[in-house]
Amino acid sequence: AMTLEKATLPVPQFDQITLDQLKAQIEQAIQQGQTFLKQLAAVPDTIQAQLSVLAQVDLLENNLSESWGVLSHLNAVMNNAETREVYQSLLPALSEYYTELGQHTALYQTYQQVQDSDAFAALPAAQQSAIKLALRDFKLSGVALEGEAKKRYAEISARLSQLSSDFSNHVLDATQAYCKPLADAQLKGLPQSSIALLQQYGQQRGLQQPAATLDIPSYMAIMTYAADRGLREELYRAYTTRASEQGNPEFDNTPVMEEILSLRQEMAQLLGFSSYAEFSLASKMAPDVATVHQFLIDLAEHARKPAEQEIAELKAMAAEDGIADLQPWDTGYYSEKLKMRQFNLSQEALKPYFPAPKILQGLFSIVSRLYGINIVEREAPVWHPDARYFELEEQGNVLGGFYFDLYARSGKRGGAWMSGFRSRMQTGNGLQKPICYMVCNFTPPVGDQPALLTHDEVNTLFHEFGHGLQDRKSTRLNSSH
């Protein structure tokens, strides 16, 4: 491989960092925050002193979110018993601290006084909007609550963070608990690349034969190509009942979801909202619950006609194979066949046009054409050999960095997401440049061939990169708070 220049931005030392160190850093950051809150007994007198309090809050938040960001990232992409234990053990303290911060009366009043002052209009627009958002967040975290209600909010908040973590762990564990060895006859219809992938999954589980897992690349391959209808049904049922009352009771999310729903409702009512949906929209663009509801209904009505037509086509095609009742585990398989018949176009035939290295090159050159930003791969410590680090440069000036971790593997949560590691903000040592993680679950490379992406995966990559770019290009100086 070509040698890369070292990262120019300060990046986390994933090759050296231990869970014990991370835990200590997080505990120390929480400690510093709590000390700061204890000392802030009243609103400072001058606007200078008030703005200085706001700046200190941003720095404390920056410290904590940086070390917590590394831990929660590892918990999502390299999940194992040790990481999970440290993560779980810190949740109560973290939740307690954020509740304390969000309900701190003197701090809230400091923000309020800055907003009410004559000096407010002269602040940079980004800072004004950050202050308005902070005031909104205080209200949403119960700053106005008193006595029992205040205590109850803190309990609910802590419990919800625990339940949300349990929920994710159950899904991950249930996904990984499933493995079905496949006989040759069951591979009928699968293209060579999918068979090689299932072979690789089998080897990883210590088997001498291909195996189906519930990882999305394996699941999609079988639902799209496997001629064996019984196999498709078995995988469909296993996949859709993960972490449910129909699976292993150890991973059952039913009680978790019931408790989350009832606590969310209680929390919303404590804060004066009629429902959790209403509470949730208080920090979103949509004006109210009815608007969102109507939007979804309109969307469904527009989609209904074409959907009915497509289902009719699939039913007709399945009937040719003697299938009288089209089931959910048949739609992926017959959709692919229909595309082949109508357009002579298969996902598989497109794949050679989308090798991952070429797609990244294409993505980066589009960004360069549209925004005049160059993307350069740099050497940086990573959590897994698949992960890579890049920096964005504009006329020789580094704007920020990002990591790509694109392929599905065991110990990694499903889906695709972007999470910030460090935000752009002015600190004591000058301007801090932003860095984020972009994570996907694409079909991994098999053997020493480059990974070949499906058209859907290419779409996802461009979508996630859009989030990342928006995050990196934003010029606001202050952090999220």
Tell where the protein language model's regions lie, with residue ranges:
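Alpha-helix N-cap/helix-initiation motif
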Residues: 249, 253, 352, 356, ...
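Active-site-proximal segment of zinc-dependent metalloprotease catalytic domains
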Residues: 429-441, 446-459
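Short, well-ordered loop/turn and helix-capping segments at boundaries between secondary-structure elements
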Residues: 31, 241, 467, 471-474
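Active-site-proximal, well-structured secondary-structure segments within enzyme catalytic domains
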Residues: 126, 130, 159-162, 169-213, ...
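Active-site recognition of the HExxH zinc-binding catalytic motif
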Residues: 456-471
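Conserved small/polar residues in nucleotide/adenosyl-binding loops
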Residues: 475-480
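Short His/Asp/Glu-rich catalytic/ion-coordination signatures at enzyme active sites or charged loops
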Residues: 6-21, 71-90, 113-155, 213-255, ...
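N-terminal helix-rich structural modules
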Residues: 2-192, 197-198
